[in-house]
Amino acid sequence: MANKKINVDEKRYSDIPVWRRYTLTIEEAAGYYHIGEGKLRMLIDTHPNEDFYMMNGNRVLIKREKFERYLDHATAI
């Protein structure tokens, strides 16, 4: 019996709505939260032990739900 190829439509990560993604790039997070890219980078630099971001090589990825919890408890950013 020959193996048959099954065509599966792959969803690209960019096709997933921002509010459903696990991580966001700095640019995506800036647009979504209306916080400047510089301010987001400063938050990451001043909070190196927080768990609302992770590094993928030299790229910063914001963990959306954890960052929202961080913002819920913040009085100022």
Regions flagged by a language model, labelled:
Residues 6-9, 41, 65:
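Residue-level detector of intrinsically disordered/flexible regions characterized by low predicted structural confidence
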Residues 1-14:
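Short, Lys/Arg-enriched anionic-surface-contact patches
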Residues 32-61, 68, 74:
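Major-groove DNA-recognition helix of helix-turn-helix-type DNA-binding domains
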Residues 11-39:
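Polyanion-binding surface elements
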